[in-house]
A protein has these predicted regions:
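Acidic donor-binding segment of Leloir-type glycosyltransferases
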Residues: 195-235, 435-438, 442-453
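A recurrent flexible, glycine/aromatic-enriched loop bordering the glycosyltransferase active site
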Residues: 240, 248, 299-328, 340-341, ...
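Catalytic donor-sugar/metal-binding loop of nucleotide-sugar-dependent glycosyltransferases
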Residues: 340, 350-369, 395-408, 563-565, ...
Length: 642
């Protein structure tokens, strides 16, 4: 539930005495601070305290706080805490106007009680109240990857999808699986999951690179289905070589890439074929959502993917397993070689998308990636070479496109940071700010403009929308320029970190009611959020109207150059550009910092995009493609929809 002044009062209304006295104190929430190494766990929390004061009440008293160290009845230390004023709000209580001053108090995790006083009002926070607030915070920020109810959620989806009849007609689906020293139990489960497919027009091509493994041979001998082809190779050719050998024996219209110890849902092929049959233009590539399973087939860690997202793909192979490609397209590209061993699916994804064929995402968990000793899923460090192969896959992709860029490995396993050359000379930047940019941002702009061309009408035209509270350094602005001047980009929004070290902006989505929802707000800036989403570039429907770099030449082409005057019109410009096939890029490699405090409460008056624009340009009910239908669209932390 969103934490607002209304929700705080709903939980604990003002008493008659408080209304009569015209003052009150309430604890709104707590959030983890950004202090310390994130991996070490919380070092401290911000406690959000509200001071209510009736309009006719005299000037407020000073708010004070004492924090008590130690868990016993007698404290081992006392510390005076300096409150930080965050915001002032105006509310109506019983038709009367009240002012609400919001303060944050920073307490370490070994301070288990605090006393807050303001005038005659006092608030004691400790024991049960403190623990309850911390638990509530944990529930608020939890995401799908740690949801203990995920197996039950998956079972409901299984029941819904199993009830759908499989297509009676459709393409021949080839499935290619390189197998090397596969544990027999997992090999059998892999084959059985294909035999259980509700869609029957398939062939399974297994390349056995362990022909002397008697346990594997015994498993193969159990099956007499003519749709299963076992191709034996006397030597292990590696993942790419074995896969390519299997491709040579595939005869289907589409080819799915399948690992030797994983499983798929019995309706996996049916869902793919359904989408293929329903498409006016046959898709070139299809992919689905997935999760992990342990050695006992217990599911966990759902990987719920967005629709095709060019910039997200440059940071990680999010398409990953059960990649399915139209076979005639495989004849148009060079098959993956040893240089991308372990990242061959990533390499193939790039090659197929370069052909500009339709890409279809099926937002259902159809694939299960097995975690066991020796698997990449269980320990990514066991196959570190695959991460270097991923770097080469991206570099080769950029080279084929004729794009100058550089790729380095990211902070997390199997993630990458792709950068591009800024244009030379640099384009000039017009600045739009409600007031004057702060001194740090102005210094950045002065340094940039000293190197930029004088005439902004030449080449790509850029405009920076920014508030006086946002500080932007030169390297961050240059990163934004690098990406804003790429083909197809309309806007670039950096991640924004608050004065207290928490996220203010780490991408946003449009909810079904048209409201714009900032994602991962108030998490510590070191927190990657759901599978590292705060750290990955993402093409989005909307950007951040408070801080973004916009291509004004693109705006002019779209006829919206002169219609951008405030945050609302900027949001509508984002949507118009996205509907026209342009990209609004969330760019976490650039960071803006807020210089002034902001509220820890949620906005009760969210801005909305113009649904007439969305429905008019998309012709369909809106579902944000940078998210996933499995997520709760009103939750900023990637929770499962119930």
């Amino acid at each position: 539930m969103p934490i607002t002044i209304s929700s705080v009062l709903a939980k604990e209304t003002l008493t008659e005495a408080e209304i009569k006295n015209g003052t009150a104190l309430r604890l709104a929430r707590c959030v983890r601070s950004a202090e310390g190494e994130f991996s070490e766990g919380p070092h401290s929390y911000y406690w959000d305290v509200l001071r209510f004061q009736a309009e006719e009440h005299p000037s407020p008293s000073k708010l004070t706080c004492l924090a008590f160290r130690g868990e016993g009845r007698l404290p081992t230390g006392i510390r005076k805490v300096s409150p930080t004023k965050l915001a002032t709000h105006e509310v109506k209580i019983d038709s009367a106007s009240w002012r609400v001053d919001e303060y944050s108090l920073l307490l370490s995790t070994n301070e288990h009680r605090m006393l807050v006083k303001c005038g005659k009002d006092s608030l004691i926070i400790g024991g049960g109240l403190q623990g309850a607030a911390i638990r509530e915070y944990g529930e608020i920020i939890s995401n799908a990857s740690v949801d203990e109810n995920y197996p039950a959620w998956l079972q409901k989806r299984r029941e819904a999808l199993s009830s759908k009849p499989a297509p009676s007609e459709g393409p021949l689906m080839s499935i290619v699986t390189p197998a090397y020293k596969t544990p027999p139990a997992f090999l059998k489960k892999m084959i059985d999951s294909i035999l259980s497919q509700s869609y029957g027009n398939w062939e399974l091509v297994i390349v056995n690179a362990s022909p002397d493994d008697e346990n594997m041979r015994r498993v193969f001998n159990e099956y007499a289905d003519s749709r299963i082809k076992v191709i034996e190779t006397p030597e292990n050719l590696g993942i790419t070589g074995n896969t390519n050998l299997g491709l040579a024996h595939c005869t289907g219209d589409y080819v799915s890439f399948y690992d030797h110890d994983d499983t798929v849902e019995p309706y996996a092929l049916a869902e793919y074929v359904r989408r293929i049959n329903d498409s006016d233009v046959k898709p070139g590539l299809l992919y689905c959502d997935e999760d992990n399973i342990d050695e006992n087939d217990v599911p966990s860690l759902p990987l719920l993917k967005p629709d095709y997202n060019e910039d997200f793909l440059l940071s990680n192979d999010y398409i990953l397993h059960w990649l399915t490609v139209r076979r005639d397209l495989l004849k148009m590209v060079e098959l993956s070689g040893k240089d991308v061993e372990g990242a061959q699916d990533y390499d193939m994804t790039f090659k197929i998308t370069e052909l500009s064929q339709p890409v279809i995402h099926i937002p259902e968990v159809l694939y299960h990636w097995r975690i066991h000793s020796g698997s990449t899923a269980g320990d990514p460090a066991q196959k570190a070479y695959t991460q270097n192969a991923g770097t080469r896959a991206i570099k080769n992709h950029l080279a084929r496109l004729g794009v100058e860029g550089d790729v380095v490995r990211g902070r997390a396993f199997f993630t990458y940071v792709t950068s591009f050359e800024a244009p030379s000379p640099l384009p000039a930047i017009d600045v739009f700010c409600d007031g004057d940019p702060n001194s740090a941002t102005q210094e950045t702009l002065n340094a940039y403009n000293a190197a930029a061309i004088a005439d902004s009408a030449v080449g790509k035209r850029l405009a920076l929308w920014i508030t006086p509270g946002h500080r932007l350094k030169l390297n961050d602005l240059l990163t934004m320029v690098q990406h804003a001047t790429r083909n197809g980009v309309f806007s670039v929004s950096p991640r924004v970190i608050r004065a207290d070290g928490l996220f203010d902006y780490a991408n946003s989505i449009v909810a079904p009611d048209g409201t714009v929802r900032k994602l991962l707000t108030l998490l510590p800036s070191q927190d990657g959020g759901y599978v590292g989403r705060s750290e990955r570039p993402m093409d989005a429907v909307v950007g951040n109207p408070e801080c973004c770099l916009v291509r004004m030449d693109v705006a002019a082409d779209l006829g919206i150059e002169h219609g951008i005057s405030d945050n609302k019109s900027m949001l509508d410009a984002f949507v118009t550009a996205w509907c026209a096939g342009k990209r609004n890029l969330y760019m976490p490699y650039a960071t803006a910092h807020l210089s002034t405090p902001r509220t820890l409460l949620e906005d009760e008056n969210r801005q909305r995009v113009d649904f007439d624009i969305l429905s008019g340009l998309t012709g369909r009910a809106f579902d944000d493609p940078s998210s996933n239908p499995a997520f709760n669209p009103f939750d900023p932390y990637y929770k499962l929809a119930k």
